[in-house]
Amino acid sequence: PTGSAASGYEYVLRFSAPLVGDEREYTLRILAWDDAGNSAMRTVKIVYQTVSEGDDIGEATIRIDATTVGLGIVDEETVRIKQGDTAAQTVLQMLEDCGYEAGYDGLAEKNGGFYLMRLTRGDLLYRAQVPERLWTLIQRDGISLTGAPGRDSLGQHDYTWGAGWMYDVNGYYPGKGLSEWMLGDGDVLTLRFTLA
């Protein structure tokens, strides 16, 4: 497992792959308990079907959330997912299709260490303003301020030193980068700008 008790553990399951077009069913039994001795067991059936690289495997929704600067969801698109593509590759394609320029570090390919640093698009930050309550909390906590960015771009170190883009999938923050994550059919990936 990776992670910790505080943040939650993550496990990677590796099943032997069936031939292309075939499928295999696996049963996973999960037993978990807490410090008080309470326990629960869940059984999950996983159907593993192999498809060829590049084949269409479903749809996902990608959102861009700039609520922390008062803009809410600035874009939301349904995208096709291709077998073998990382979340980073899918996100970059969506951003390009929607007219964004993405500044990033690393590579979008699997295990490429991808980090989304900045999004740029004309008037992206038009009417942006950090909500007063959030700004008060940032100042109260002594977070180092850096100043507001220009009108067309939002990214790392804008407003505060801890600011940047994070992502969640279906409300869960994976403990790995976008180039280590693969999207599944029906997933909702949110790119969320944070200030701390």
PLM region descriptions:
Residues 1-196:
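Ubiquitin-like/PB1-type beta-grasp interaction modules and other compact soluble beta-rich domains
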